[in-house]
Amino acid sequence: MVRLASVNVNGVRAAFRKGMQPWLEASGVDVLALQEVRAEREDLEALLGDDWVIAHDAASQKGRAGVAIATKVSHDEVRVDFGPKSVDTAGRWVEVDITTPAGNPLTVVNCYVHSGEAGTPKQDAKYEFLEIMTKRMAELGASDRPTVVVGDLNVGHRWLDIRNWKGNLKNSGFLPEERAYFDTWIGHEDSEDYNLGTGGRFVDVGRKVHGEVEGPYSWWSWRGKAFDNDTGWRIDYHLANAPLAATVTDYRIDRAPSYDTRWSDHAPVIADYDI
């Protein structure tokens, strides 16, 4: 069994100061995918310790973005080159091939999609990234190798994924054009092959496990009573191809017990894979 946790840490050093380390020690995680690391590799090594093997892709601007995958086993291969050099994708995509303790191949992809802002160059950059991501997703989906794409994808695919979806129809994160990319990766919710992982598509593990329910959410604003009232967004995902999705034994969003015990505005998304 491999337990994989993905979380946007909003700066890994700050997260550890606020209580991430006790959570990690108690989590039983074998593979840890972090987004918005905002730190150097040396910082990760110092915080995580010698038990972890780390693959890290830093952003081109210091103190921005950054993704990392840490595992308890060695890496067979690491890939960070993503898309044309004319597009700055640094700090947003890293792939790691490992062999699980049971001797099975596994590819873990960690992704941090731009937050965007409707009608601005930030949104243009988000679409540019999503286009490149879609091409790579098709390549990954064409392989039978067990593969999962995790991370903060900064889009709610369906109305079930956002508490206040009607008020966000014109906002980045729930724009029709953004959600259409998820239709390509997972299938449209009204299609017969939705979320089955057929035809090179992926399975939204969270939706597969929880079914047609609102949420459960993975992000809540720090402002107001959003966390206490569970006014959240489900924008953090495990997207597994069919061979891997068939091995899922457990999935949960590890929501903090209270506002003051949070160490990020995102909650870890954890899945167990029998592989």
Feature map (PLM): residue ranges:
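N-terminal, active-site-proximal structural segment of metallo-dependent hydrolase catalytic domains
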Residues: 1-49, 53-55, 59-67, 185, ...
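Active-site beta-strand/loop signature of hydrolases that rely on acidic residues for catalysis
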Residues: 4-9, 20-42, 108, 136-159, ...
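Structured beta-strand-rich core segments of catalytic domains in phosphoester-bond hydrolases
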Residues: 38, 43-116
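Conserved beta strand-loop-helix elements of the APE1-like EEP
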Residues: 62-78, 214, 228-247, 273
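Surface-exposed cleft-lining segments at the edges of enzyme active sites
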Residues: 83-84, 113-130, 167-172
